[in-house]
Swiss-Prot record:
Single biological process term from Gene Ontology: methylglyoxal catabolic process to D-lactate via S-lactoyl-glutathione
InterPro entries assigned to the protein according to its UniProt record, in alphabetical order: Clx_II_MBL (IPR035680), Glyoxalase_II_hydrolase (IPR050110), HAGH_C (IPR032282), Hydroxyacylglutathione_Hdrlase (IPR017782), Metallo-B-lactamas (IPR001279), RibonucZ/Hydroxyglut_hydro (IPR036866)
CDD domains: hydroxyacylglutathione_hydrolase_MBL-fold
This protein's record includes keyword Metal-binding: yes
PANTHER family, per the entry: HYDROXYACYLGLUTATHIONE HYDROLASE, HYDROXYACYLGLUTATHIONE HYDROLASE GLOB
Gene Ontology terms for molecular function: hydroxyacylglutathione hydrolase activity; metal ion binding
Catalytic activity: an S-(2-hydroxyacyl)glutathione + H2O = a 2-hydroxy carboxylate + glutathione + H(+)
Similarity field: Belongs to the metallo-beta-lactamase superfamily. Glyoxalase II family.
Residue sites binding Zn(2+) 2 per the record: 57-58, 127, 165
Annotated cofactor note: Binds 2 Zn(2+) ions per subunit.
Organism: Xanthomonas oryzae pv. oryzae (strain MAFF 311018)
Functional pathway: Secondary metabolite metabolism; methylglyoxal degradation; (R)-lactate from methylglyoxal: step 2/2
HAMAP family documented for this protein: Glyoxalase_2 (MF_01374)
Stated name of the protein: Hydroxyacylglutathione hydrolase
Length: 255
């Protein structure tokens, strides 16, 4: 299977997994136009859509795509804010699409019904795990988001993270503010700057790299805990407390 990142809006990515015969699985199509343009240019035929959550920048292209390809199947979490034509999937379920096996993982936090789709090579994490960051908690709690990230962190290190937005450079600035002596993080920032200068996506990225550089996956590290505790002006009794304070810090952070 070939993986294609389709830019949408200002910083979204729609993902396409493409079989040798041109049939494709589309993940989080917030816009129809990038999918249609790619299909026309490369001879793709979308056969299924996977949705991680209900936000418009991830689902608003669905109706137009289903009109263009009437047989298109749709899989999503059970959420009244998602088109009713979807097949609802939940934690632990497995799908076999175009000879690819997908596992569904529940990852609430960004939204209350957010899910991720995992294959033997790829993690489609939506707005839960980002390159060098994580999503804002619009509907969930810090313990929920922390648990969701820990669930994803247990996947094999070679898994490629395919998230919903190109946030790497902005996230790198915050990550280095927190973890300034991390040499791997410094290298990632330099690599990402070169990629973006060349108009290339910084994604996908290996989970192994995220575990070494993403502060939201490193809340057990003494250097992270110390910096976050200093900002909080007091002891933080658990990793969840560290995560919650780190997420608050990121929400307020500006260069």
């Amino acid at each position: 299977m070939r993986l294609i990142a389709l830019p949408a809006f200002d910083d979204n990515y729609i993902w396409a997994l493409v079989a040798a015969d041109g049939r494709a699985i589309i993940v989080d199509p917030g816009q129809a136009a990038p999918v249609i343009a790619t299909a026309e240019r490369e001879g793709l035929v979308p056969s299924a859509i996977l949705l991680t959550h209900h936000h418009g920048d991830h689902i608003d292209g669905v109706a137009e795509l289903q009109q263009r390809w009437p047989g298109l199947e749709l899989f999503s979490p059970a959420d009244e804010r998602i088109p009713t034509t979807a097949h609802h999937v939940s934690h632990g379920e497995r799908l076999s699409l175009l000879a690819v096996d997908f596992q569904v993982i529940e990852v609430p936090g960004h939204t209350r019904t957010h899910i991720a789709f995992v294959t033997d090579r790829h993690l489609f994490s939506g707005d839960t795990l980002f390159s060098l960051g994580c999503g804002r908690m619009f509907e969930g709690t810090a313990p929920q988001m922390f648990d969701s990230l820990q669930r994803l962190a247990c996947l094999p290190g070679e898994t490629l993270v395919c998230c919903g937005h190109e946030y790497t450079l902005a996230n790198a600035a915050f990550a280095l503010h927190v973890d300034s002596t991390n040499a791997a993080l410094q290298r990632r920032q330099q690599e990402a700057q070169a990629m973006r200068h060349a108009a290339r996506p910084t994604l996908p990225i290996s989970l192994k790299s995220e575990l070494a550089t993403n502060p939201f996956l490193r809340t057990n590290r003494p250097e992270i805990r110390a910096v976050v505790a200093a900002r909080a002006a007091g002891a933080l009794s658990s990793e969840v407390d560290v995560f919650a304070e780190l997420r608050r810090w990121k929400d307020e952070f500006c260069l």
